[in-house]
Amino acid sequence: MMLRLSVKKRCMSRTIPRISGLQGSIYSSRNIFVVRSQKGKPTLRKSKGSNDGGAVNNKEKLSEWVDSDFERKMKQQEVEYERRLKELKSLTASVARIIKKKEDIEKLQEIPMPSEVNRDAEKIYGSLEVGKEKLASLPENSPSLSGIEKQPEPFNASNHSLITPAIDMPESITKRLGLAIKFLVSKTNINWTMVLQQLKEGGGFQGLPERDIRMFIYSIPKEQISHLIPVLEQLLEEGNVKKSSKIINVFIAGLSHGGYLSDESIAQIEQYCNHITKINKKGKLSRETYELMIQAYGKNNNLEKINMCLSEMKQNKLEPSQKTFSNILSTCVYKANDHKQAVEIFDSMKFLSQKTKPDTRAYQDIIVSYVNNDNIEKALDLYREMITEKIEINQRIMVALARGCTSRPELRFKAWDFIFDIYNNNWEPTLNTFEYMLYLSAKDGDVALSRAFYSKLNESNAITPRSFSFLLLAYSKSQVSQPGQSIELPPITFHEKGRNFRRNILSDVNLFPASAQNGIPFLPVLDLTSKEEIMAESSAMWAHTLMFNPSFVNTDCANTFLNIAAVMGRLNDFIDRYDSSTFLDRTGLSNDTRIIIEELPDSISSNTDISQTDGESVSSVQSKFDEMSITKSPLLKDVGSNIGLGNRKISRTSLSYVIALKAAARFKNYKFAQRIWSERGTFRKTSNFKDLSRSTKDALDFQFANAMVSCLTKMNLLDDALAILLSTEYQFKWTWKELRELYQAASDIDHSDACKSIRGIAKRAQINYEGKIRRKDFKRYVMERGY
């Protein structure tokens, strides 16, 4: 039976506040539902459009892949054992031959030789030898054995110089440099500015062969030539040397070297291309120039210009090379994040011609793209394709596959397999590999191993913002002991190599560093076993990073830092971190924003232990919390005396508000939830949100709306959650993934009207967004076709 509390006693008929973060206004009466007895509880019915069958098939495919890969490795090990056995047999045979040969030599040495023959031979050899005394008595100007006396050559200082350049340099350039050749002695520290200055004073490029000039320009490294282009152009102009297309290509390669290219650099490169078209008889660019242009546009994240270059190459009947396709593929994966375009380019490389077949780098980029788009199944298929086609596999591919396997519970064990394959192939793990080992242990909730990896990176002075973010992720994912809850062992412990690997890493952790400067504020225990320990250590790590590595702190780290408190701490802990480590950036916010203060229902009170009373300042409330808190770092408590700590806050993002709603739902605090969605409405009017693309805005709004529905559901405010669904039904694509929690809560209390409305929303979404045919349309189709 369903129990509904009276709405009159507690003023529950008040309207829900206006929600600024969504289109339109939502007004609905509030009802609090109490869960009835579990006896006879109806089960959740699956909809016809449910994807459970697809999920089961996907799990079966993953299991089949794991089994087949295990069989492949077993066969590979069997072949390896047979090879080693053959090597052992051949080694045994060769050792036997060596021993037999040695025995034969010993037998020959045992045969006695006539002493007379030995004695005569010694006399003959002694008479033929010339002693050192005889050699010393010979005159110095004695003729040679051939009877021809060699004449001494005249000394040439240029041929006997003690200074030689570390790079190949044309002889004509070397003569003009003179003593400035000393600037070219060290290959790593060449002062090219002084070299060009001395060359200019020695006559520059006047009268030098064009081939020697090109060789000299080719010898300048790409990372330095961009700063020397004005001097080189002046030398070419003074020497009446025309800038050929090959020299200009060197300039373009120098300008496009490095990471991101600005629009100014692209404009300068385009000017050089226009110059090439003018000096070229046919007015066309070469294949090399097009490849350099595509590489430059890729670093500028300009896919439109890349497509224009490809169209021009097609018009000029220039087939793109494998290098060109690889540059475009890398741009789509790492710069533009265009997975669809990346897949099309990769397929073109496979089927266009034999010359453009993808190599290891191309497979690496497309596997990373599939992993980034949560399609580890396709990434594993490509990995198997590389094995079948005998394409070389590198360490980055293994790391990407390990990272992707963490997204599937069925493949958590397989993720560490890929990591251990790096050691099996005798590869030296890179910093990127160590960081993702930390990531794997963090996703597994293995705080002890994550702390050990972070400590190892700290000892090597190799800590990066990414590794710090992964450590915070480990704190938030940690499985601490709770009454009545079991702890799952990390997947690495189910692996024989993994157990040994984990034990060796943990046994080598130094929790007491010799130097305080290089130390990190870890608790002096091997593992953290309580939420208080996790909250305290994460707060200490945050304060330590703010003081010594402030550049590591970014929006991702701040959101993870908030999530630790949302999962492990109390509501006071979360509010303290929310206010002290993040802030609302009001850039772009107009001054005419209205603030509406509505009275809260009396039935919903704050769950915080410390609440602000009338006349009490925020600072006094904060100081009171700091005095009582045992999990907040003393450095963060005394922010006033720590210069700069109080100003090192991170601007909030949409994810920050989602995490805040999760904390409000966990503690069922409606007051804090109302504050969050009110501030989220203000955040939508700031530049940080308005500058985003339309699709990104819609995705973030849907994420927050889903968090609101989940928050209200956990507070048992089912009518409010349903009101949000009804008001945004045609704005967002609601699926059973988001609706299942509310539907389950409504079915538990036999709220049939809510269940019916939720099913209707899911059904209409399948028709509007998924292209599902209506029942009446299907009947009409059958009637017209006759079957």
From Swiss-Prot:
Source organism per UniProt: Debaryomyces hansenii (strain ATCC 36239 / CBS 767 / BCRC 21394 / JCM 1990 / NBRC 0083 / IGC 2968) (Yeast)
Instruction: Give one Pfam family, short name only.
Output: PPR
Known role:
Regulates mitochondrial small subunit maturation by controlling 15S rRNA 5'-end processing. Localizes to the 5' precursor of the 15S rRNA in a position that is subsequently occupied by mS47 in the mature yeast mtSSU. Uses structure and sequence-specific RNA recognition, binding to a single-stranded region of the precursor and specifically recognizing bases -6 to -1. The exchange of Ccm1 for mS47 is coupled to the irreversible removal of precursor rRNA that is accompanied by conformational changes of the mitoribosomal proteins uS5m and mS26.
- Entry's family note: Belongs to the CCM1 family.
Keywords in alphabetical order: Mitochondrion, mRNA processing, mRNA splicing, Repeat, Transit peptide
Please list the residue ranges that the record marks as compositionally biased, kind Basic residues: 38-48
Q: What is this protein called?
A: Mitochondrial 15S rRNA processing factor CCM1
Can you tell which superkingdom this protein's organism belongs to? Eukaryota
Q: Which InterPro entries match?
A: Pentatricopeptide_rpt, TPR-like_helical_dom_sf
